[in-house]
């Protein structure tokens, strides 16, 4: 019922997530942040079972920060993605698996921007664009049609809005507000939330 999306540009990664926290068919909150700051230039987006998402994301977050304190430098997005995948895979084979779907976005001085897609079975893939949730079925075709590797930030935001408008039109559930952030060489930046008003019938 949740939705995550990421778009990688030539020198940035644009990500967005819905802000609804739901329990079964009940909306509990409409201002829930599903993005977790791993380091100055790495962001983890996490959806899934309510308890699992926060517990797993915070566990990864604290371990990435511990790595920096021990070694004096931060993990690269690639290293953070592989560390996250390994932990998710280990938990999957234990008595306490986490049911979480993830996007990891980051920027590295040497490798540039990176976007990683990971599902609850710990399958990891580097992708130019990615989405999680039922909304992904409705928007991946739009991303495939309009995405280019050299897409500018302005065009990426337009493409993001096009995807979210498609969700409002075709998705039966109400996801009215989305958090939007950009990761680039200067760090993580908050963009203005994208909000849709309910259509009157």
From Swiss-Prot:
Induction: Down-regulated by theophylline (THP) and 1,3-dinitrobenzene (DNB), two reprotoxic agents thought to induce infertility. It comes from Rattus norvegicus. This is Proteasome subunit beta type-2. Non-catalytic component of the 20S core proteasome complex involved in the proteolytic degradation of most intracellular proteins. This complex plays numerous essential roles within the cell by associating with different regulatory particles. Associated with two 19S regulatory particles, forms the 26S proteasome and thus participates in the ATP-dependent degradation of ubiquitinated proteins. GO terms for biological process: proteasome-mediated ubiquitin-dependent protein catabolic process. Belongs to the peptidase T1B family. The lineage of its organism: Eukaryota, Metazoa, Chordata, Craniata, Vertebrata. It is found in: Cytoplasm; Nucleus. The modification N-acetylmethionine is found at residue 1. Keywords: Acetylation, Cytoplasm, Nucleus, Proteasome. GO terms for cellular component: cytoplasm; cytosol; nucleoplasm; nucleus; proteasome complex; proteasome core complex; proteasome core complex, beta-subunit complex. InterPro entries: Ntn_hydrolases_N, Proteasome_beta2, Proteasome_bsu_CS, Proteasome_sua/b, Proteasome_suB-type. CDD domains: proteasome_beta_type_2 (cd03758). The 26S proteasome consists of a 20S proteasome core and two 19S regulatory subunits. The 20S proteasome core is a barrel-shaped complex made of 28 subunits that are arranged in four stacked rings. The two outer rings are each formed by seven alpha subunits, and the two inner rings are formed by seven beta subunits. The proteolytic activity is exerted by three beta-subunits PSMB5, PSMB6 and PSMB7.
